[in-house]
Each structure stands twice: as structure tokens, then as C-alpha cells.
Amino acid sequence: GPSSPYNLLYGWPNPLFSGKTTLLNTLVRNPFIFDLLIRVHIMDLHLFNESIFRRYKSNSQRIRRLSEDWFEEQMYCPACKCDNLESFQNNTPVADFYCPKCMSQFQLKSQSNPFGNRILDGAYSKMIESIHKGDQPHFFLLHYTLNDWSVLNLEVIPNYFFSESIIEKRKPLAPTARRAGWVGCNLLLSRIPEDGRIQTITDSIIHESKEVRTNWLKVSFLKNQKSPSRGWITDIMWCIKDLDKKEFTLDEIYSYKNHLAKLHPLNKNIKPKIRQQLQFLRDKKYLKFLGSGEYQLKKR
């Protein structure tokens, strides 16, 4: 009817959407389709909520609340089989949501532009401290469009892909700034290996929760690694992905020696360290050793 939330967003009547609504109603009446819809995690990609929209005047406040409300209503836990996440009642300095089953914590970052090579984050010192302690929340990156207030892309980065290698220290704020001398940081998304950016929604196409959780599980071998080791492993994973080859040689990874030396300036034995990480990735079934210095990236 005209007062339904759907029509409050799109207007009434709206022939553009009426066909889709009729089709959906028809599909739901089909027992097979209905059973399928029950068994998979169904998402509504529309962010719009009239009550939230009217409650706030600035668009920045509106989109922050709309994205948080959408996330809590629609998102599941990628780390376990829990189908809902809950928001912290009192805003924590870092995390926004948590899983009531496995207690994983998540931070949500939302923006209307596609995420580029880097994103702004908080205080540099706090970020480094959090990485060393291992209590950094997992990151969700939500990309939306204001054309129809809907989600276009959503990805999650497990916290064990966070290392000093992906943190860029920013210049201190000017003496005239309100927080003079404060030092922030950027997250260098371009330095995170592909396996560390798990796609949940891609170009408005929703990935099945089973696929998302499988991809999460495939990299969970990093979970119990300490910060310095984790940084080295993920940096080597990035080098492997950068080669963009299913099979590669040890010498090809050695070609990243200078790149790795810049990321780990205190380590003077780069080649032995490379071999150590490759051995670890072999042990974790991420790589297969073919012999004679050749490796194969296993299907993920």
C-alpha cells in the first residue's frame, strides 16, 4: 500500500518497481523457491529508513545512522555461523559491532566513493599498539550510492591482516589546529593481499554467506600468529598475489627483496626470511612445492 516502507522510498504508484514486486511475490509462492530463500541469507541492499532520515538534518549524520542501522539488520558474522551482529550499546573507541556467539568485534567504515588505495583511520600510536596486542577489530568497508540509497559493495578484512606494513603514519596536525601535534594514520588497502579482502557484496551482487565464511576460514591459519610473524606472512602473500601467476619460482619472490627490506628495515636477512614464510605457507596448504624452487598457489 502507499504507506509501506517500500513505497515511502520509491513513491506510489511506481511502475518501474511494480513488476519486480509482482515477480518476487510469485517466486515466494513457489515452495521450492521459498525453501531456498529461507535457507540462504537474504539481504535487502536498500539503506533508506524514513524515521532515521527525518530524525537527522545533515546528510553525514543520516548516512552514518542509515549505514549502521542497515548493517545491524542485514549483516551476519563471517567468522562463525551466527546470522546476526549486535551493536555496542555504548560506543567503544574502536569497534562498532560484535558477534553474540563468537564475540568477534567489527568496525564499519562507509563512504559513497569506491575505496581507493588508502583510507583515513585514527591515531597512529593507538593503531600500532592495537596491532601489537592483537585486539584490533575486523574491518568492514561499505560502499554505497546516494542515487537510490543502496549498498553497492561490502568487504571484510580479518584483523590478522593488519600489520605495521599497511599502516602509514601521517604528518602531525599543525600548531594552529584544535588538536595540534596529533598524529593520525592511513590504512594502505593496496598492501593487503587479495585473500585478506573478503567480498560480501560486489557491484550489488550478494555473495552467499557460505562462500564468505569459507573464504574466511581459508585464511584463519593466521589467527594465532604473533604480530611480527603475521606481518611477514601477509607481506609474502601480497607478493605472491602481485605476481598474478598460479605457479612461480623462488627467484621471482626474491625479486621483491628490496620492497620487503623497506617494510622490515630491522631485518638484514631477507632471503632466509622469505624462504621461512614460504615454508609456513606450504605447511598451511596455502602453497604446494613443485620442486626445484617452484611453487604453486593452491585454489582458494
Language-model-detected regions and their locations in the chain:
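Charged low-complexity interaction tracts in eukaryotic proteins
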Residues: P272-R300
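Positively charged, polyanion-binding regions of nucleic-acid-associated proteins
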Residues: S227-E247
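Short, flexible, mixed-charge glycine/proline-rich loop motifs
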Residues: R64-Q74, S87-P93
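Short, positively charged loop/turn segments that connect secondary-structure elements
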Residues: N258-I274
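Short metal-binding segments enriched for Cys and/or His
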Residues: M103-G122, K126-D135
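Short cysteine-rich clusters marking metal-coordination/redox-active sites
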Residues: C77-C80, C99-C102
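Short acidic, hydrophobic short linear motifs in intrinsically disordered regions
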Residues: K246-L263
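Long, low-complexity, charged/polar intrinsically disordered regions in eukaryotic proteins
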Residues: N159-G231
